[in-house]
Amino acid sequence: MGSVLAEVAGSLASIGYGLAAIGSAIGVGIVVGKTVESVARQPELAKRLTVLMYVGVAFTEALALIGIGTYFLFR
């Protein structure tokens, strides 16, 4: 019985990381979409907005990397 529960816990951890990765991908999509929308409104700010977009994408992807790190740490 204990081995079955261990297998279920391992599967739940994998599902949890998968959901975290999906959340990160949605976040990146929102950041990039809003940047494109902002550049369409004010093209003169394109360079500054692009830099801010990369910072936002980096922070969003860092959450996914933290998620995979905790998955391997607590596995």
UniProtKB/Swiss-Prot annotation:
Q: Where is this site: Reversibly protonated during proton transport?
A: E61
Transport: present as a keyword of the record? yes
> Entry's SUPFAM superfamilies?
F1F0 ATP synthase subunit C
Gene Ontology cellular component list: plasma membrane; proton-transporting ATP synthase complex; proton-transporting two-sector ATPase complex, proton-transporting domain
Regarding the membrane, this protein is recorded as:
Multi-pass membrane protein
Protein's job: F(1)F(0) ATP synthase produces ATP from ADP in the presence of a proton or sodium gradient. F-type ATPases consist of two structural domains, F(1) containing the extramembraneous catalytic core and F(0) containing the membrane proton channel, linked together by a central stalk and a peripheral stalk. During catalysis, ATP synthesis in the catalytic domain of F(1) is coupled via a rotary mechanism of the central stalk subunits to proton translocation.
Q: How does it assemble?
A: F-type ATPases have 2 components, F(1) - the catalytic core - and F(0) - the membrane proton channel. F(1) has five subunits: alpha(3), beta(3), gamma(1), delta(1), epsilon(1). F(0) has three main subunits: a(1), b(2) and c(10-14). The alpha and beta chains form an alternating ring which encloses part of the gamma chain. F(1) is attached to F(0) by a central stalk formed by the gamma and epsilon chains, while a peripheral stalk is formed by the delta and b chains.
What is the protein's name according to its record? ATP synthase subunit c
The species this protein belongs to is Tropheryma whipplei (strain Twist) (Whipple's bacillus)
